[in-house]
UniProtKB/Swiss-Prot annotation:
SUPFAM superfamilies, A to Z: Restriction endonuclease-like
Disulfide-linked positions: none
Protein name: UPF0102 protein azo0871
Entry's Gene Ontology molecular function annotations: nucleic acid binding
Organism encoding this protein: Azoarcus sp. (strain BH72)
Family assignment from sequence similarity: Belongs to the UPF0102 family.
Region described as Disordered: 1-23
HAMAP family: UPF0102
Pfam families xref list: UPF0102
Amino acid sequence: MKTDRKAERSGIVGAAASPMQARGREGEERAAAHLAAQGVRILARNRHCRGGELDLVGLHGDMLVFVEVRMRANPRFGGAAASITAEKRRRVILAAQWWLAGEGRRHAHRPCRFDVVLLEGPATTPPTWLQAAFDAD
C-alpha cells in the first residue's frame, strides 16, 4: 500500500501507511503517553520541513522540549540509542529551528532541550526517556 505523504504530513487520520510507518506512529503514541504521564504537555507531533522532522514537541514546565523517538525491537546493531547519529541530531536541530521560526514562534523565548525516548524490545517494555540527550552546539 502506498503512503499518501501529503495526507500524512497534514495529520489526516487514516492516511495509508506502510506497516513500518504504522509501527512508528504507534511508537510515537506510546512515547507521547509516557511523556504526558511525566508532566509534558505535547504541543506538536510529526512536523516535517525540508531536511528534517520533529517527532514530538512539548512543554516540560517552562522548558520547550524537542523529542526524537527511536524504536528497536531487537538490540542488535547497538539498539535504539545507537541509531541517533550526528546526522540525525543535525536534522532534528534544523527542524527545531524551522518550527521555532514558524508554528512555534510564540515559544521562541523559552529555553529548549533535545530529548530522546527509546522504545526497545516488546511493547510491554517501559520507554526510556533521556532528557537533554544532545545539544544544539
